[in-house]
Amino acid sequence: MSGHNKWANIKHRKAAQDAKKSKIFTKLIREIIVAAKEGGGDPETNPRLRAVLERARAANMPKDTIEKSIKKGTGELEGVDYQEIIYEAYAPAGVALYIYAMTDNKNRTAQELRHLLSKHGGSLAESGSVAWLFERKGIIEIPKEKIADFEEFAMVAIDAGAEDIIEDDPIQVITAPDMLTEVKDKLAENGFEGEAKVTFIPKNTVKVTGADAEKVLKLVSVLEDNDDVQEVYANFEIDDKELEEIMSKLEG
């Protein structure tokens, strides 16, 4: 599954490069509002809020923007009521897409996604037809240079409750969703600070190459550029070299 992990890492790198762009802030603000609405405004008692605040600070979001977003979520300030919605879809070559959105208008979002999918060779799928292909997991990403002794790191991660460790850059620690905060904190106590989030990992992947690979990546890219879309999960597999070439072309 290295081609899939490489794609996730390229997206991670691109997000870091794009951190000052307003689109990244727009998505993070929505996440903060929804997390605060769901679990309250105190990150000490709201793991979901704590995780998104760490990402917001890493993206250099102003403190004032963060505080206002939290207050909009808790109701202390007036704000937009966002709903979390999953859209299931197919890309070219039978690749499954699990699209996580936050929207204040479900009809608008569905219409926009239907248009983007149709334009790029994809289609919306019936509810439940794609969900079973993905597994909800926690993931902690730690830059490789922060880990001097991988064996020591792996022992700490496994003892803390990690299910799997993917030796890439960044190093990825996979956990059960309800163990994410506990494992992250245990790693941090031992000097291994990382960024944590809940994600959806494909159970199996579909190998795509050539024109199909380019079409799939282009579709995922335009979907993620939509303001209502927070994340697109996909079950494709593309060779690392080809993936890098296509992503460079799309980014250029």
From Swiss-Prot:
InterPro entries: Integrase-like_N (IPR017856), TACO1_YebC-like_2nd/3rd_dom (IPR048300), TACO1_YebC_N (IPR049083), Transcrip_reg_TACO1-like (IPR002876), Transcrip_reg_TACO1-like_dom3 (IPR026564), YebC-like (IPR029072)
Gene3D superfamilies: 1.10.10.200, 3.30.70.980
Keywords: Cytoplasm, DNA-binding, Transcription, Transcription regulation
This protein's GO CC annotations: cytosol
Leader sequence segment: none
Keyword rRNA processing in record: no
The keyword Transcription regulation is annotated on this UniProt entry: yes
Main location: cytoplasm
Biological-process GO terms, alphabetical: regulation of DNA-templated transcription
Membrane-spanning intervals of the chain: none
Subcellular localization: Cytoplasm
Family label: Belongs to the TACO1 family.
NCBIfam families attached to this UniProt entry: PRK00110.1, PRK12378.1, YebC/PmpR family DNA-binding transcriptional regulator
Protein name from the UniProt record: Probable transcriptional regulatory protein THA_1246
Annotated organism of origin: Thermosipho africanus (strain TCF52B)
